[in-house]
Amino acid sequence: MIKIIGLDPGMSKTGWAIIRLEEKNNIKFLGGGTISTDGKLGVGERLHIIFEQLKKVIFLYSPNEAAVEKIFINKNPKSSLTLGYARAIAILILRMTDLPMNEYDANYIKKSITGNGHADKGQIIFMVKQIVKSSNIKCHHTADALATAICHAYTKNFCFMGIGS
């Protein structure tokens, strides 16, 4: 069975979600959460927290593939730069654990999940809950990571080729 980790990197909050592709094109939500870092800490300390927590998640769930939301350029260059740091840490841990990785634009993820490339957070949360048949997804960072993982499964056609079974 294929397990996919989806990541929504951020310096303050990094969302993660793990799905498993099952028989009959079902997608099972195995776990998800948000890695939070305190803004009072230095950049190095915050990045270390993200790195260590992601490493624990990867070793706990042993995913086969990874999907990461691509960076978007914010109006505030400092925000874009710190987002880039968090993405770099996420990509580094995926590389260190030999996980094949794909990156997806936020609008592409939204369109693949909701049919609308400009869907809002509420629409994404609603749709991922429907797809994985779970009401346990409350945080939008986890929902975004879950949407990224589902988007990867759809894009790679795992669900439609019977590979998950």
UniProtKB/Swiss-Prot annotation:
GO cellular component: cytoplasm; Holliday junction resolvase complex
UniProt-listed GO biological process terms: DNA recombination; DNA repair
Annotated Pfam families: RuvC (PF02075)
Main location: cytoplasm
EC assignment: 3.1.21.10
Positions that bind Mg(2+) 2: 69
Swiss-Prot/TrEMBL catalytic activity: Endonucleolytic cleavage at a junction such as a reciprocal single-stranded crossover between two homologous DNA duplexes (Holliday junction)
Family, per entry: Belongs to the RuvC family.
HAMAP family given in the database record: RuvC (MF_00034)
Protein name: Crossover junction endodeoxyribonuclease RuvC
Organism listed in the record: Wolbachia pipientis subsp. Culex pipiens (strain wPip)
